[in-house]
């Protein structure tokens, strides 16, 4: 029962990895540059990118849960759609998706619209999911 975490080296991702490891989960971390990944020895580090289909297929092999944390970038929506389609293809049972508070209300804001679009895609695909809608992260302002 392996959990794949994308964005594992980011502010949120590092904390997710730490908490899952502390709870005894089998964690696989998707990173672009393994030399920059400093995780406990029990974490399996796989190199890949959310726009690299082959690396995602490899990373998702044998995974039961995908914790989808993708950065706020221009192709964020595309990254998520690729990941979701590959997760379905890989037979992943559960998606945990980090969205944003009020994504359904502020769809006129591009970032919110993208997050809400991903939420709708998860629903449309019939994937088992937990969608997290946190408020703003103040920690992101100091990094």
Which positions does each model-derived feature cover?
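Short, basic, glycine/proline-bearing loop/turn elements
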Residues: 69
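Oxidoreductase cofactor-interface core, primarily capturing Rossmann-like NAD(P)-dependent enzymes
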Residues: 1-41, 51-63, 72-75, 81, ...
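Cofactor-binding loops of NAD(P)H-dependent oxidoreductases
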Residues: 48
